[in-house]
Each structure stands twice: as structure tokens, then as C-alpha cells.
């Protein structure tokens, strides 16, 4: 189920066929849009999202054929946009603290895995996994500079 403590939270959730989203939001000024859609296709999506803190913006889409699984643990001020779409099985495990901006797309018929563990100062990550072959990416980073960034394209 969905558990929200705090105030000024905007949550929009749309699910279709075999969807499971466990969402826990604590704090204020959080916005979450989750759309797990298969429409007439078969399969399942899974999302486990925990948000603690404030000023968080999430947009998570898991669409169409293939199992998509997402774990997301957020603490602090973060912007996260995730698209897991296409026919392949895709997996993401994201853990964030402090100020981070993520833009992640996993698409194509390949089975893609991504794990991002970020802490420290502001980090901007753009990860694109779009291929018919399987792609894996792992990043564990503690940003000690004023800001850090990475752009990764696997196709």
C-alpha cells in the first residue's frame, strides 16, 4: 500500500495488469508520478519507492512487455526521471541522499540492469541503456567536489 506522512505531497499513480507499487513518502513538497502500463500486453512491473525528506520530484514510467523492477530509496532534495520501456526485462536499484538529478532510460529488447548509489554533493547522472543486447551499469559515488556529473550511453 501507499503510506504518506507530511504535507504538500502530489501523488499520481496509474497501473494496469499485474502491477505492484509499494510507496512510502515522508516529508513535504514531494511530487511522485508513477505509471506502470501494459495495456493489452502481459507481464508485470514492480516498484518499491521510499522517499524521506523534502522538495523531491519523481517521474517513473515502466511500460509495455517484459518485467520491469525498480527499487528507489531517496533522502533529501532529488529530481529523478526513470523510463523503463520496451520489450526487454529491465532492473534498477537506486539509492540517493542529498541533492541529485537523475535521468534514466532503459529501452530495447535487451535485458538491462542498473544500480546507482549516490551520496555527497550534487550529482547529475544521465544513463541510457537502449539495445537489443543485455547492458549492465553500476555506479557508487560520493561526490566531494562542488558538483559531479556523468553521462552514460549503452546501446
Positions of PLM-derived features:
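Low-complexity repeat regions of mature extracellularly deployed or surface/particle-associated proteins
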Residues: 1-155
Amino acid at each position: 500500500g501507499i503510506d504518506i506522512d507530511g504535507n504538500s505531497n502530489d501523488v499520481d499513480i496509474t497501473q494496469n495488469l499485474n502491477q505492484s507499487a509499494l510507496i512510502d513518502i515522508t516529508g513535504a513538497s514531494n511530487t511522485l508520478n508513477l505509471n506502470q502500463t501494459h495495456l493489452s500486453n502481459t507481464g508485470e512491473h514492480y516498484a518499491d519507492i521510499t522517499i524521506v525528506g523534502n522538495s523531491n520530484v519523481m517521474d517513473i514510467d515502466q511500460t509495455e512487455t517484459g518485467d520491469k523492477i525498480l527499487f528507489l530509496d531517496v533522502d533529501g532534495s532529488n529530481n529523478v526521471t526513470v523510463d523503463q520501456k520496451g520489450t526487454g526485462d529491465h532492473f534498477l536499484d537506486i539509492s540517493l541522499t542529498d541533492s541529485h538529478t537523475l535521468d534514466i532510460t532503459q529501452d530495447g529488447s535487451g535485458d538491462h540492469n542498473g544500480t546507482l548509489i549516490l551520496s555527497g554533493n550534487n550529482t547529475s547522472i544521465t544513463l541510457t541503456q537502449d539495445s537489443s543486447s543485455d547492458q549492465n551499469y553500476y555506479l557508487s559515488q560520493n561526490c566531494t567536489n562542488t558538483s559531479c556529473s556523468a553521462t552514460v550511453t549503452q546501446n
